[in-house]
């Protein structure tokens, strides 16, 4: 059975977005980027909400991103190689290949996907992840904690659940980012 993993960048105070909804508070860091690329490459299927999907679709729709460096080319290859399931009630059609749309996050369907997938699944985006956490579907969490206090919005982790977790890994990057 495949694992369903959740990965997210977050500020020290637990937010994924700044107060205006932006992500650019996490400046480029090559070592962190390599680690995230390896994590992305370890999954065969990504589960996204519409907003996260639209943010990341550029890794397939904008060839200039992949051409910037070997690091970005590797990330683009990993992203494009994976199947994507996008949960959206408003998106009319996929923006990328290897992508299917689902109107609702159905717990039984995701359980079935975990049971039949040949590779692990990676859920991206805190809102969709909160649904997976609430259903008891998340097997592992990978957080990249940036040394910044945002006072932002959109918490990286559900605020209405208590879960006992086991620390499997920790790594501190030279930039101060900590991967848990």
Give the predicted meaning of each segment:
Residues 1-180:
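Enzymes that bind and transform nitrogen-containing heteroaromatic metabolites
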